[in-house]
Amino acid sequence: MVGVLPDQVPNDEGGVFANFFGQQALTMTLVSKLVARSQARVFCGFVVRLPKSGGFKLTIQEADQSIYDEDLITSVAGLNKSVENCVLMAVEQYQWEYKRFRRQLDRKKFY
């Protein structure tokens, strides 16, 4: 088992631009390349804080099926879709302060 934080912004050589919540975001290719080599199944896991100091709930779900596509861009888009699906289950708890869109295709500042 390998754990990866897939929404971290990679360097230019380690990523491609793909849709993430309607914006182009530089996205790592590592997961897609590992899947292509290993044919491993991909799961997404995240933790939600429960109200009133009730602890945490761990959720694990299968990744979007397009992550297995042979086309790198399609696979990376599937990775982003997988993250989106997790975020949508607890939007208020996603780390929105992380500057996910700081690297843009046109090199303009997003923030």
Range-by-range predicted roles:
Residues 1-111:
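Non-catalytic C-terminal accessory region of glycerolipid acyltransferases
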